[in-house]
Amino acid sequence: KKKKPNAVATKRYKSRFFLKKGQVVDILKTEDVVCIRATSGVLSAYDNHGKHHLLTGNSMTELEAQLDPSRFFRVNRSEIVNINYVLSFESYAKETLAVNLQHMSEPLITSKTRTSDFRKWLAT
């Protein structure tokens, strides 16, 4: 019998997005993504230059599973944030927070069900 290796397989997370624009494919590194937002089923990544890019081929849930959970957190049903761009947060409404991000003009609002986990995630 062959022995199974003891090494634990480490999951590899998405490190870049391919953005097709006509015949050209641009590359957006995940480290440059400030947040991802779904609007009417269309996903957009907002980068650290204030630009947004359409993402195709994934649902929000599928995309969330491909991103490193130590760096990305889904704050509500339609938005994911990158921890490296969180500037501050403040109480917003009952059990929700307004999260201020670099390069974004308006805060993102956590859902009631994710607020507690968001605080824990930021503290790790």
What are these regions (language model features)?
Residues 1-124:
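Basic, polyanion-interacting recognition surfaces, primarily
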